[in-house]
């Protein structure tokens, strides 16, 4: 039995709160059950040096976790003077996922940076970050359209992500920490709102998984992401 008696294909309750902070062009608190991530999108009329003069924009991301987002305190990475490998991997994943649904040529020389800060972690922080960042980025782009700095929407659709895995021989969608820590297979799937794959990260932590099990996991991810996209659209419609 899953926590909260969820069905195997059921995602955790989602809450997306827009305009969560006062200053960012896009600000979202996204909650997947007990996992909570603050996603702030910042607009700069500037691009990295290597993009200057090309008439293209850029989307990037940063990821971090508050020291007491977990059961025991984690030391701030700033205190050690460098980011950890996991942090760098996750923020690159978030940025790639966001860029996959943006026409950078339409942006002109504008950069959007989305900061994803985990304030409470109960599994699926990177997937929650991507799903929340998509809404924050949409709000930031809408602010550019409203101000006339953009004439056309460069965002081609939503992007969302979910974790899936095999726990006790059962394929499950949207793993909580207690499930993730016991999983034989753990996978993160990122997709566009029309069901196209952006990234699949999958590892057999224990028993190797079969092709049939892979297809089961991808089917669960497809349904879960469709449910997340519905929540994203509903939040933006408010």
Curated annotation (Swiss-Prot):
CDD domains: RNase_PH_bact (cd11362)
Subunit structure: Homohexameric ring arranged as a trimer of dimers.
Name of the featured protein: Ribonuclease PH
GO biological processes: rRNA catabolic process; rRNA processing; tRNA processing
Pfam families: RNase_PH, RNase_PH_C
Superkingdom: Bacteria
Reaction catalyzed: tRNA(n+1) + phosphate = tRNA(n) + a ribonucleoside 5'-diphosphate
Keywords: Nucleotidyltransferase, RNA-binding, rRNA processing, Transferase, tRNA processing, tRNA-binding
Any one GO molecular function term: tRNA binding
Coiled coil: none
Chain residues that bind phosphate: 86, 124-126
Function (record text): Phosphorolytic 3'-5' exoribonuclease that plays an important role in tRNA 3'-end maturation. Removes nucleotide residues following the 3'-CCA terminus of tRNAs; can also add nucleotides to the ends of RNA molecules by using nucleoside diphosphates as substrates, but this may not be physiologically important. Probably plays a role in initiation of 16S rRNA degradation (leading to ribosome degradation) during starvation.
Family: Belongs to the RNase PH family.
EC id: 2.7.7.56
PANTHER family with a match to the protein in the record: EXOSOME COMPLEX COMPONENT (PTHR11953), EXOSOME COMPLEX COMPONENT RRP41 (PTHR11953:SF0)
Database matches in SUPFAM superfamilies: Ribonuclease PH domain 2-like, Ribosomal protein S5 domain 2-like
